[in-house]
Amino acid sequence: MSIFETIIIAIVEGLTEFLPVSSTGHMIIAQNLLGVESTEFVKAFTFIIQFGAILSVVVLYWKRFFQLNHTPAPEGANGLQRFLHTFDFYWKLLVAFVPAAVLGLLFSDAIDAMLESVTVVAVMLIIGGIFMLFCDKIFNKGSEKTPFTEKRAFMIGLFQCISMIPGVSRSMATIVGGMSQGLTRKAAAEFSFFLAVPTMFGATVYKMYKIFKEGGTELIMDNMTTLIVGNVVAFIVAMLAIKFFISYVQKYGFKAFGWYRIIVGGIILIMLLMGYDLQIM
């Protein structure tokens, strides 16, 4: 990969990872337009640069990530309950993270097999887009007074499992999950960002473990400059994308993202019908 290709792909990652538009679908188009061959390193590159995107969330919301709950625990709470009350933010992240983590470990081979189908990505982009056209009306605007309980966190985690189908978009699934639990657009989007940190970090570390286990250490070390550039670009672009997204959805909702998904899915299907040999990076 050239530096130009590295930067473009990292920009695509940063722009699409936290927006409900499917980063996988955009990677397919970017790869084809750039003429990048889907080698083992290119596949590794596309998930390793997720570290940069993950870091953008931690930096933007560092106060939320490193602030404990110092309010008094409920009267009569035992030691465990007081502990969970203090670490309330991390506890609910863990509750939401577990469903996808368990399914990911149990069905990793089946998920990898689905990731080979570009048609599935295109179809799910369109189906998800149609749903997003109406999700604002279906779930209204939510309420800032809605208590964020462990049950609601777990339900969002179940929604995240749907995103294992390529083309759905992890961001879309978890945001819709949050809105279905009565959260506002902003609260649902922000928890989606927070949940991305353990989810994407865990998935990336697991994939890197598989690479190293299969003797891919040299593959990573020989391309360290490319990986560093990709992570830096993804970090910067993801920060800008998150700021834009939060501001936009508070004012206008998700309909524009629905139409956008339908267009992108349609483009991929047309390219397939025209005989393009599209591959997932």
Language-model segments: what does each one mean?
Residues 1-281:
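Multi-pass membrane proteins that catalyze or facilitate reactions on polyprenyl-/lipid-phosphate substrates
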